[in-house]
Amino acid sequence: MADEGKSYNEHDDRVSFPQRRKKGRGPFRWKCGEGNRRSGRGGSGVQSSRFEEDDGDVAMNDPQDGPRVRYNPYTNRPNRRGDGWHDRDRIHITVRRDRAPAERGGAGTSQDGTTKNWFKITIPYGRKYDKTWLLSMIQSKCSVPFNPIEFHYENTRAHFFVEDATTASALKGVNHKIQDRENRRISIIINASAPPYTVQNELKPEQIEQLKLIMSKRYDGNQQALDLKGLRSDPDLVAQNIDVVLNRRSCMAATLRIIEENIPELLSLNLSSNRLYKLDDMSSIVQKAPNLKTLNLSGNELKTERELDKIKGLKLEELWLDRNPMCDNFGDQSSYISAIRERFPKLLRLDGHELPPPISFDVEAPTMLPPCKGSYFGTENLKSLVLRFLQQYYVIYDSGDRQGLLYAYHDGACCSLSIPYNPQNPVRKNLAEYVKDSRNVKKLKEPTQRFRLLKHTRLNVVAFLNELPKTQHDVNAFVVDISAQTSTLLCFSVNGVFKEVDGKSRDSLRAFTRTFIAVPASNSGLCIVNDELFVRNASPEEIQRAFAMSAPTPSSSPVPTLSPEQQEMLQAFSTQSGMNLEWSQKCLQDNNWDYTRSAQAFTLLKAKGEIPEVAFMK
């Protein structure tokens, strides 16, 4: 880049982003002509319209207001024709009769040249509902999965867009099916719409490749610092007529995706002078650049310190905020520092000034987690019920044919699987068979994908379980906790280990946590209505302990060949330890019928939580 384009890091030893191995895609290289395969849909190219005149302020057409009215979430707007009829206690789902029919929609063109119909969804009084709750409730009642585009609040309403007539028609079917906590019915108004603004302005794959190249020129590998100051006016972008405005959601998303894929170890980022007036679209940087220590947001349009709440998950040590309107909100320096440190307690420098050391109550000495206390059942009746259920369940689960589990699940049961997600430590190869079905909500942000990976009805649940690797569980080492119980419902979790017995990962040991919600069954047993399974690689300690304590062969009485003295010792040991006769005999035999040694071994193993619950079932 020309000398006049340099800023923030003035040196001549600029390097490209380090080569990184993508997931299954070989090493990363900077290739301008190669399309970005993860870029998603594209939109129009450079905008030579009024959006350039306002230097990147986001505008969006509202189909209710006509094509000339700009979307501005901060202005009060009068009610328009048709809005006044709503009764707050009776809300309906309606398609406006003075607009285009829902089946026709507003036309838009995708990158591949196909035409798409767009619809704007409006929820009157939607502002009083949490976004996650509102979308999940609509999705639960909608007959097809949908992807809400550009969800936002405007005055008292909530809005989002969908991109096809089938989805719009399905949303019409949600009429009178959702009620809030005050038993008010929630309506959905559907209008044909032009494509949402951010979709129109998505960068094309070739533009993303150019942006990637320019970001590589602005990256200092020695300092792990990326300088995106005044990115829109970058000479190379201007020369190629590419308009990258970081206060547009599509541009910020493309930029953060490039960072995530190529330099997630980034330590310093300069976003000064980019006309940023909100940080909603930047919130994912917490996951995409978790090591970030220095952030420069100076010379932007941030009006309130509350915008920083969107990124307060960053462990920042240095932050620049000068020349933002928010700086004028504070009467003195101490209140300014206090407000910022409330969001970033480890901050050492603000606007270039050293801060006094943060007050910390962190315990420097290493602390040990308390030892596991073993299972908790509440009552002996519940203990007997749950242990009997688990023994029957895992006999079938480990048999190789899990079809028999159909009788363990309710007709409307649901089930999900998840595996660990850590951006700094990607899933290792030996968990590959679980990746495609993992519903880890820390990784999956799209409601559509979350919905798809939730298995509904007992037929689908058991079909899904049949596809998982064949297993052998260490039932004797299960730790069971009952967390909730009513007369009609029981919630309990199971922790343990299992071994895969076939396939590429044969003999691999896994640890798992499984949470069951069950209701009473007609046979005095349990019927599962909800099943959540979490699988991870077993730790070295878990591998060492696994299958170490095999269950003795059950019998109703002591072995007949025992001497009278041994039988008397066995009865006494069973009474004092609380274990049944089979496990008491095993303990005595393992210690050569030395009563004192047996008692000491029992006390030690019980303190470590290594005696299974079945040992106490009589």
From Swiss-Prot:
Residue ranges of every copy of the TAP-C domain listed in the record: 564-618
Short motif (Nuclear localization signal): ranges: 66-99
Modified residues (Asymmetric dimethylarginine): 41
Region Disordered, residue ranges: 1-113
Keyword Transcription found: no
UniProt note on tissues of expression: Expressed ubiquitously.
Region spans: Interaction with ALYREF/THOC4 and LUZP4: 2-197
UniProt-recorded Gene Ontology molecular function terms: mRNA binding; RNA binding
GO cellular component, one term: nuclear speck
RNA-binding keyword on record: yes
Domain NTF2: 385-535
InterPro entries found in the cross-reference section: Leu-rich_rpt (IPR001611), LRR_dom_sf (IPR032675), NTF2-like_dom_sf (IPR032710), NTF2_dom (IPR002075), Nuclear_transport_factor_2_euk (IPR018222), Nucleotide-bd_a/b_plait_sf (IPR012677), NXF_fam (IPR030217), RBD_domain_sf (IPR035979)
Entry protein name: Nuclear RNA export factor 1
Organism: Mus musculus
